[in-house]
């Protein structure tokens, strides 16, 4: 899908992108999973080559941040959650050339959707491609900050469940949720660090106008403030995981202790019953009129004796 936007009084407005409408007036070309015809149109009308899927997947810095005859290129991660609430990072290719911003991505992303909604009612300050790029990065950082806050909130709820829970199913569910939150936190951190690298490259290589240079530095400061919070999330997750595993081990030990005590308590009565169950010819107790009730009483006493002993030693 191809979308194009132009500036009118420093405010983004969408261009109709039918075949008859040229793209030359667009300041922002946004492509989501473009087909061959859309790629060819951008190439023929604007002379811009677009990144391929293998190029989007490259992770080395030289393939993600570079400048060539086709413009300034930045490939950056954007965080998303799909319909099934599975988190991930999707690479977006940014290219700035001749005062125009090209964005190429493989899916719809929350940061882009939020920025387009804001752009309907907010005017840009300088109205250039660099400001567009930095505004998108700024929206991304806001989204990541919200995600960190959501993880904090979820961890607080899990902390109460783990510290107050007394059922094994609660701990199992808590461990599963903790693993999921740790995965989300790792993806958020990866996105923050990747954005930090992209902005550092932009500050070093691009001749940013004064307003955009300060904007880039402000976003970098925001990232620096978020990274320690993100790191503390991992510490909290690890603590809660260890606490949950500790409580699970305590519960398992309690169950094992119960079975051990039961087996020890029933071992002496079993020995008594086995003794009187032997078929020898000379067993005087067999002829006693109180032999059977006496054996039953003996078995009960044999079971009570170790139980009372364990109680006295506070082993139960």
Swiss-Prot record:
Residues exposed to the Periplasmic side: 274-287
Topology within the bilayer: Multi-pass membrane protein
Keyword Repeat attached: no
Signal peptide: none
Keyword Cell inner membrane: yes
Name of protein: Magnesium transport protein CorA
Main subcellular localisation: membrane
Self-association state and partner proteins as the record states: Homopentamer. In the absence of Mg(2+), interactions between subunits are weakened, and dimers, trimers and tetramers can be observed in vitro.
Functional note: Mediates influx of magnesium ions. Can also mediate cobalt and manganese uptake. Alternates between open and closed states. Activated by low cytoplasmic Mg(2+) levels. Inactive when cytoplasmic Mg(2+) levels are high.
Organism whose genome encodes this protein: Escherichia coli (strain K12)
Chemical reaction(s) catalysed: Mg(2+)(in) = Mg(2+)(out); Co(2+)(in) = Co(2+)(out); Mn(2+)(in) = Mn(2+)(out)
One of the GO BP terms on file: magnesium ion transport
Subcellular location: Cell inner membrane
Family note: Belongs to the CorA metal ion transporter (MIT) (TC 1.A.35) family.
Site (Essential for ion permeation): 253
Keyword terms, alphabetized: Cell inner membrane, Cell membrane, Cobalt, Ion transport, Magnesium, Manganese, Membrane, Transmembrane, Transmembrane helix, Transport
Pfam family, one: CorA
Cytoplasmic side: 1-254, 311-316
Superkingdom of origin: Bacteria
GO cellular component: plasma membrane
Transmembrane regions listed in the UniProt entry: 255-273, 288-310
Domain statement: The central ion permeation pathway is formed by the first transmembrane domain from each of the five subunits. Mg(2+) binding strengthens interactions between subunits and leads to the formation of a symmetrical homopentamer surrounding a closed ion permeation pathway. Co(2+) binding also induces a conformation change. Low Mg(2+) concentrations trigger both a conformation change within each subunit and a loosening of the interactions between subunits. This results in an open ion conduction pathway. In addition, this results in a less symmetrical shape of the whole complex.
Alphabetized PANTHER family for the sequence: MAGNESIUM TRANSPORT PROTEIN CORA
One GO molecular-function entry: magnesium ion transmembrane transporter activity
Motif (Probable selectivity filter): 277-279
Coiled-coil residue windows: none
């Amino acid at each position: 899908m191809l979308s194009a936007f132009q500036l009118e009084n420093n405010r983004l407005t969408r261009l109709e992108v039918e075949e008859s409408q040229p793209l030359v007036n667009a300041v922002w070309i946004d492509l989501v999973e473009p087909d061959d015809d859309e790629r060819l149109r951008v190439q023929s009308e604007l002379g811009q080559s677009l990144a391929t899927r293998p190029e989007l997947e490259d992770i080395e810095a030289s393939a993600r941040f570079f400048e060539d005859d086709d413009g300034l290129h930045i490939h950056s991660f954007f965080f998303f959650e799909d319909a099934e609430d599975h988190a991930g990072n999707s690479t977006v290719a940014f290219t700035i050339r001749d005062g125009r911003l090209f964005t190429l991505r493989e899916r719809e992303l929350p940061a882009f959707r939020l920025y387009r909604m804001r752009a309907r009612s907010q005017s840009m300050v300088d109205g250039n491609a660099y400001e567009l790029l930095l505004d998108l990065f700024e929206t991304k950082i806001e989204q990541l900050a919200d995600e960190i806050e959501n993880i904090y909130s979820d961890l607080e709820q899990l902390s109460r469940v783990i510290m107050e829970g007394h059922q094994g199913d609660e701990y199992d569910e808590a461990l599963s949720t903790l693993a999921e939150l740790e995965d989300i936190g790792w993806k958020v951190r990866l996105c923050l660090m990747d954005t930090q690298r992209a902005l550092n490259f932009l500050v070093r290589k691009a001749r940013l106008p004064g307003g955009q240079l300060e904007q880039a530095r402000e976003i970098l400061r925001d990232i620096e403030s978020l990274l320690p919070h993100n790191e503390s999330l991992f510490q909290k997750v690890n603590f809660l995981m260890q606490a949950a595993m500790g409580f699970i081990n305590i519960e398992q030990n309690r169950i094992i202790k119960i079975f051990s005590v039961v087996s020890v308590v029933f071992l002496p009565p079993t020995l008594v019953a086995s003794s009187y169950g032997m078929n020898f010819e000379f067993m005087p107790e067999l002829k006693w009129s109180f032999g059977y009730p006496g054996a039953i009483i003996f078995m009960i006493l044999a079971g009570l004796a170790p139980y009372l002993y364990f109680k006295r030693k506070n082993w139960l």
